[in-house]
Each structure stands twice: as structure tokens, then as C-alpha cells.
Amino acid sequence: MLRFKELYKKKIIESLKKEFSFKNQHEIPQIKKIVINMGVGEAIADSKVINNALNDLTLISGQKPIVTLARKSIATFKLRENMKIGCKVTLRKDRMYDFLERLVIVALPRVKEFRGFSYKSFDGKGNFTFGLKEQIVFPEINYDKIDTIRGMDITIVTSAKTDQESKFLLSGFNLPFYN
């Protein structure tokens, strides 16, 4: 079984019960899914770039991503409707906990000048979104084989009703916060 999943079941649930005094087991917040989005603006000029982004995201997530398409045409960006402009992957269950573990233990310590996440990144409904500027912080990506450095947006969707519950939940997984 995964270490972060065991950590949640054995320690985090108990500390959440003590902190927020939940009466029902189903009130206890949990992580529902993690969505990783990689926008590829260069795909407008060169359609082969999207394949490299798909390969990177597949290596990082361990799951095949879907290609995201433009919803409407924007002439200033030379963008047409239904053009490929990025890729995303939604992780649930065991893959979600595996990715979170690799993110916290391996990837975040490799980010330069990283002090932690701001509490302002919560959306008011218990979800947490942050961005990484480089995909090379993940050990699965070989630095010599990438064509360009790309960033990604990572959203952690929780069942928490408030940001305070979500902060407490994610802090239990050793996600570093400052403030």
C-alpha cells in the first residue's frame, strides 16, 4: 500500500477529527483528485511540440494525458477553434497518492529557492492550485532529452468545505506552507 494513503488513514484522519470535531465519518475532508495541466502555447506554430509535452506529462503522471483544444478563435494569437493548445491529466485513487508522494518528497525539494506555498493559493472552496515552472524537477524527466523547459499547473481538489480544513489536510501530507 502507498505510504501517503496509509498516512492519511492512520494519522491525518485522527488529527482532523480532533481539530474540527467532525461527528460523521463522511464529513472528514479527503483529496478527491489531482489535475495536472500543461499549456503549450508554441503548439500554435509547431504542432509537433504537443507530442513532446504529452510524453513529458505521461512520464510525470504515469497515465496518458488528453489533449486540450482551443474553445474559440483569437486572431491576435493566430489561434483557431479546436487547435491543440495543451494537455492535462486527472489522477485519482492510488496514482493520485503516488504522485503527491513524489511531488512532496522528490520534486519540491529540487525547486530552486522554494520556501513553501502561500495560503492565498486556495480558492475558497478547499481546492489548492499552484504552478511549477520546470518539468525537470521530476526525476522521470531526462534533462538531455527534453526540447524545452515547460511549466505546469497542479490543482489538488479536496472534499473540504473551507480553506482552513483543506490547509490542515494538506499540511498533514507535509506540503510546505508559509505565512
Swiss-Prot record:
It holds the Pfam family Ribosomal_L5_C. GO terms for molecular function: rRNA binding; structural constituent of ribosome; tRNA binding. GO terms for cellular component: ribonucleoprotein complex; ribosome. The keyword ATP-binding does not apply. One of its GO terms (biological process) is translation. Keywords: Ribonucleoprotein, Ribosomal protein, RNA-binding, rRNA-binding, tRNA-binding. The keyword tRNA-binding applies. InterPro entries: Ribosomal_uL5 (IPR002132), Ribosomal_uL5_bac-type (IPR020930), Ribosomal_uL5_C (IPR031309), Ribosomal_uL5_CS (IPR020929), Ribosomal_uL5_dom_sf (IPR022803), Ribosomal_uL5_N (IPR031310). Part of the 50S ribosomal subunit; part of the 5S rRNA/L5/L18/L25 subcomplex. Contacts the 5S rRNA and the P site tRNA. Forms a bridge to the 30S subunit in the 70S ribosome. HAMAP family: Ribosomal_uL5_B. This is one of the proteins that bind and probably mediate the attachment of the 5S RNA into the large ribosomal subunit, where it forms part of the central protuberance. In the 70S ribosome it contacts protein S13 of the 30S subunit (bridge B1b), connecting the 2 subunits; this bridge is implicated in subunit movement. Contacts the P site tRNA; the 5S rRNA and some of its associated proteins might help stabilize positioning of ribosome-bound tRNAs. NCBIfam families: PRK00010.1. Belongs to the universal ribosomal protein uL5 family. This is Large ribosomal subunit protein uL5. It comes from Rickettsia typhi (strain ATCC VR-144 / Wilmington).
